[in-house]
Amino acid sequence: MVKLALVVIFLLLASLFQPLTAQSSCPGNKKETWPELIGVPAKFAREIIQKENSKLTNVPSVLNGSPVTKDFRCERVRLFVNVLDFVVQIPRVG
């Protein structure tokens, strides 16, 4: 019975910490992903993203496979591109 109580307490505590560690969206952002931009040149993709959401001030191009930080930022969308500067992954806020 004590083990069951400990398991229940652990699960309750774990559920409290989950919202603190996993942020999936930003308040006020209407659109957070752009799957339609795969295969589009990065310059045009950047213009479309910033036109659709003016809060996104940081839209860098990143060569696909390059290391990036894991921090979540509501004002950033990374454009993962190939060597020809075409978008190869779905752009998303973060």
Curated annotation (Swiss-Prot):
Xref: InterPro entries: Prot_inh_pot1, Prot_inh_pot1_sf
Keyword terms, alphabetized: Disulfide bond, Protease inhibitor, Secreted, Serine protease inhibitor, Signal, Vacuole
Signal peptide per UniProt: 1-22
Tissue specificity: Mesophyll protoplasts and to a much lesser extent, roots and germinating seeds.
Subcellular location per the Swiss-Prot or TrEMBL entry: Vacuole; Secreted
Record-level GO cellular component terms: extracellular region; vacuole
Site feature Reactive bond, where: 70-71
Disulfide bonds: 26-74
Location (main, coarse): other
GO biological process, one term: response to wounding
Alphabetized GO MF terms: serine-type endopeptidase inhibitor activity
Chain's role: Stress response. Inhibits trypsin. May play a role in the reentering of protoplasts into the cell cycle.
Family from the record: Belongs to the protease inhibitor I13 (potato type I serine protease inhibitor) family.
Entry protein name: Trypsin inhibitor 1
Organism from which the protein derives: Nicotiana sylvestris (Wood tobacco)
